[in-house]
Amino acid sequence: MTRTNTLAALATETIGNYLAKATYYQPAVLKDRDPEDLHQMRVGMRRLRTAMQVFGPVLILPKSAREPDVAAIGRQLSRLRDLDVIAELLQQQYLPDLPGGEGQALQPGFKYLRQQRKRAFKQVKATLKGDRYQRLTTRLTQWTEAPNCGELGPLPAAMVLPDLTVPLLSRLWLHSGWLIATEIKRDKPQPVANLDAELIDIYVDQPQLHGLRKQVKRVRYQLQLVADQYGDRLNTDLANFQALQDILGNLQDSLVLAAFLNNAIPDWEAQLPTLKARLSQSRYQAWGQWQALQKRYLNPQYRDALRQILMVPGADATQPKAAAKSRRKTTTTAKKPPRKTPARRTAAKKSPAEQPPES
């Protein structure tokens, strides 16, 4: 994405790019040959929705081409994608390590999965061929060709970006998920150490953690929209947010998989003890990785360091000394958790003719 001077230009370019990327994958999704196409279309819709949220104060979008309309399409894609993630987890990460008897016991789960996916794909197909999707893409394309950005549009992007981005970050810092399994020490929240697996399972099942993962993803997308306006100063934070999102995703995957098995296979824990143990082990490992990042992000100096960056756009802007010192002390590149499944992989390489639109 090229750097632009006005808020209207930045908003219009961003909306246009993400609309093009999202709609690029629609024909392949309807052919249903590679789950990666669905994944990329869903990501495109999420980024388009994020752009509408970030630039909401400046956008005057046509009816049927607004953020709730994008969200409705995204929900249909998400239902199907969740089933694909379950299939990849079971087939590639867990099934190869199961004893023969447990592998057979898992087969009814795959049958149930195929039935559920058939229904979900039928809904996605109807959605992408339906009037709502067609109105959304047509009217939004027309808007990008003749954008209406209201009175704030002509303002310099650098002047307005702090007012758009800092509130987004504040909502993340105020999320209650950060306080899961913490205790107050010296007037500051600290993660509780040495929890047993049973207690960890209780904490992992709390909706606050799932909500935090979604909020981290949302903020990461939001900051990526404006990252070019800050040079390379957001790169470390974006990488750390990605690692945190992956770790929380691992915790969430185990819950989603267990819920699926409860519906697919009666008494699955008794029939699949090895799988049950593997899921528990996966949660325990991811929990330790989560607590390391949790401790970092509960540090007020670390939080303020990112806030100070967002306050001063520009590739060559100088950070306040206190913020820079805090980041040198606390910022390390977070290790991404080992992940055998391609469930959250990046876009598969395609030939030049098949590449999605460049941003």
Give residue spans per PLM region.
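Cationic, histidine-enriched alpha-helical/coil surfaces that engage anionic ligands
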Residues: 1-359
